[in-house]
Amino acid sequence: MADNPVLELLLRRLEVADGGLDSAELATQLGVEHQAVVGAVKSLQALGEVIEAELRSTKCWELTTEGEEIAREGSHEARVFRSIPLEGLVQSELMHLPSGKVGFSKAMSNKWIRVDKSAADGPRVFRVVDSIEDEVQKRLQLVQAGQAEKLAEKERNELRKRKLLTEVILKTYWVSKGKAFSTSVSKQEAELSPEMISSGSWRDRPFKPYNFSARGVLPDSGHLHPLLKVRSQFRQIFLEMGFTEMPTDNFIESSFWNFDALFQPQQHPARDQHDTFFLRDPAEALQLPMGYVQRVKRTHSQGGYGSQGYKYTWKLEEARKNLLRTHTTAASARALYQLAQKKPFTPAKYFSIDRVFRNETLDATHLAEFHQIEGVIADHGLTLGHLMGVLREFFTKLGITQLRFKPAYNPYTEPSMEVFSYHQGLKKWVEVGNSGVFRPEMLLPMGLPENVSVIAWGLSLERPTMIKYGINNIRELVGHKVNLQMVYDSPVCRLDIEPRSSKTQEAA
């Protein structure tokens, strides 16, 4: 193996060595990098029993960059002492020297210098002793010469505290002769070529044995973002439960479908510019189902269907305002309206997973854009008990079995419930979703039969993803700060399997 001179030198030294060789000492003797000797050792190991190599770990001391500078030029305090003439030096001038600030305090501690605050030109620094011994420099030079063991532990700790010395673990090999030791070794073939087969030369050539423990080359392919992996799992759960996916391709929505159709009054705080992104162009939606619009207007302003309404002047121009949808319930309203137009009524299950937009303050857990998961069931005689049963089935498929329900308020559902789950990592109950039964004031103007009820629930996609993958800042999951390596390395998502550890749960 003439193409590797370090390997040849290793074999020659080993031939005459008594017992064996240390790889680090050999590297020093040959004047080469230790890694070059390690490479030669591993090449010989691959040839079989030519050598035996025992990996050893030893602690050693190395100088930091600052430590090397001090070993060469002296400590900061010594440099400060040498810079002070016999007549003294103004303290302000001393502090502007490269080693002034650090060296001044150390020299004062060593009682090498003193400060005269009564000087006419301001505080003045004078020498206290005629000469000094730079012990710090001497100790560092000992370490540099490989004699760190001559230093007392207290002296080493002092140098470490000043960040002049660091402890490292040096991994070396003790190399000795193997059963098949020889100074002349031939390179083993790594591949069987067509030429070897046709000429028959393969019979006389040594081949490198297969390493079945070696990792294969990772396939060069695209990688799904963790959000897409979790989204796929949620989608699969809905499909297993017999749901149909709603179209959610209209990010731009009219205020009518986003608010009014949901029996949300036009004076509601959520419709304020501080919470919603309104469009400048096009500012208004021109096409609305006017018959349905009139029924919604009457329900808001006058009441109906057993409700008193909100008793205010409902304005069409307010309902026409375009916005970035604040929830996918707008898509649910469209789907239910389309369902109401089909006669006779047919029970249906719908779901959607898509982006929504809120004009919120950005922080570690909130973005102006996020994903909402929503499930809707329309059927005859559905009650709150049906909703709780469906929620238990849904969250059980997510691996969440401990649930609690708390009464809540939503403008378009009554009764409404917040869903809580016991978080094993945080050791407390945390909110995982919102739910309710759609109000008759929302459903009957659409044209749905009076004995039809609609139950619905929703949750965000980002929160379970952050918990699943141990992410505690949403900006590390979405946006320009995302680490692409995280996308490459994130495992396949299984929502029915516990997250990685309680520590990652606490972080999320």
Curated annotation (Swiss-Prot):
<comment type="subunit">
    <text>Heterotetramer; dimer of two heterodimers formed by FARSA and FARSB.</text>
</comment>
<feature type="modified residue" description="N6-acetyllysine">
    <location>
        <position position="311"/>
    </location>
</feature>
<keyword id="KW-0030">Aminoacyl-tRNA synthetase</keyword>
<dbReference type="Pfam" id="PF01409">
    <property type="entry name" value="tRNA-synt_2d"/>
</dbReference>
<dbReference type="GO" id="GO:0005737">
    <property type="term" value="C:cytoplasm"/>
</dbReference>
<dbReference type="InterPro" id="IPR006195">
    <property type="entry name" value="aa-tRNA-synth_II"/>
</dbReference>
<feature type="binding site">
    <location>
        <begin position="372"/>
        <end position="374"/>
    </location>
    <ligand>
        <name>L-phenylalanine</name>
    </ligand>
</feature>
<dbReference type="Pfam" id="PF18553">
    <property type="entry name" value="PheRS_DBD3"/>
</dbReference>
<comment type="similarity">
    <text>Belongs to the class-II aminoacyl-tRNA synthetase family. Phe-tRNA synthetase alpha subunit type 2 subfamily.</text>
</comment>
<feature type="binding site">
    <location>
        <position position="414"/>
    </location>
    <ligand>
        <name>Mg(2+)</name>
    </ligand>
</feature>
<dbReference type="GO" id="GO:0051290">
    <property type="term" value="P:protein heterotetramerization"/>
</dbReference>
<dbReference type="InterPro" id="IPR045864">
    <property type="entry name" value="aa-tRNA-synth_II/BPL/LPL"/>
</dbReference>
<dbReference type="Pfam" id="PF18554">
    <property type="entry name" value="PheRS_DBD2"/>
</dbReference>
<keyword id="KW-0007">Acetylation</keyword>
<dbReference type="GO" id="GO:0009328">
    <property type="term" value="C:phenylalanine-tRNA ligase complex"/>
</dbReference>
<dbReference type="GO" id="GO:0004826">
    <property type="term" value="F:phenylalanine-tRNA ligase activity"/>
</dbReference>
<keyword id="KW-0479">Metal-binding</keyword>
<dbReference type="InterPro" id="IPR004529">
    <property type="entry name" value="Phe-tRNA-synth_IIc_asu"/>
</dbReference>
<dbReference type="InterPro" id="IPR036390">
    <property type="entry name" value="WH_DNA-bd_sf"/>
</dbReference>
<dbReference type="InterPro" id="IPR040725">
    <property type="entry name" value="PheRS_DBD3"/>
</dbReference>
<dbReference type="GO" id="GO:0000287">
    <property type="term" value="F:magnesium ion binding"/>
</dbReference>
<dbReference type="GO" id="GO:0006432">
    <property type="term" value="P:phenylalanyl-tRNA aminoacylation"/>
</dbReference>
<keyword id="KW-0067">ATP-binding</keyword>
<dbReference type="InterPro" id="IPR040724">
    <property type="entry name" value="PheRS_DBD1"/>
</dbReference>
<dbReference type="GO" id="GO:0005524">
    <property type="term" value="F:ATP binding"/>
</dbReference>
<feature type="binding site">
    <location>
        <position position="329"/>
    </location>
    <ligand>
        <name>L-phenylalanine</name>
    </ligand>
</feature>
<feature type="modified residue" description="Phosphoserine">
    <location>
        <position position="301"/>
    </location>
</feature>
<dbReference type="Pfam" id="PF18552">
    <property type="entry name" value="PheRS_DBD1"/>
</dbReference>
<keyword id="KW-0460">Magnesium</keyword>
<dbReference type="InterPro" id="IPR040586">
    <property type="entry name" value="PheRS_DBD2"/>
</dbReference>
<feature type="modified residue" description="N-acetylalanine">
    <location>
        <position position="2"/>
    </location>
</feature>
<keyword id="KW-0963">Cytoplasm</keyword>
<protein>
    <recommendedName>
        <fullName>Phenylalanine--tRNA ligase alpha subunit</fullName>
        <ecNumber>6.1.1.20</ecNumber>
    </recommendedName>
</protein>
<feature type="modified residue" description="Phosphoserine">
    <location>
        <position position="193"/>
    </location>
</feature>
<keyword id="KW-0597">Phosphoprotein</keyword>
<keyword id="KW-0547">Nucleotide-binding</keyword>
<keyword id="KW-0436">Ligase</keyword>
<dbReference type="GO" id="GO:0000049">
    <property type="term" value="F:tRNA binding"/>
</dbReference>
<dbReference type="InterPro" id="IPR002319">
    <property type="entry name" value="Phenylalanyl-tRNA_Synthase"/>
</dbReference>
<feature type="binding site">
    <location>
        <position position="412"/>
    </location>
    <ligand>
        <name>L-phenylalanine</name>
    </ligand>
</feature>
<feature type="binding site">
    <location>
        <position position="438"/>
    </location>
    <ligand>
        <name>L-phenylalanine</name>
    </ligand>
</feature>
<keyword id="KW-0648">Protein biosynthesis</keyword>
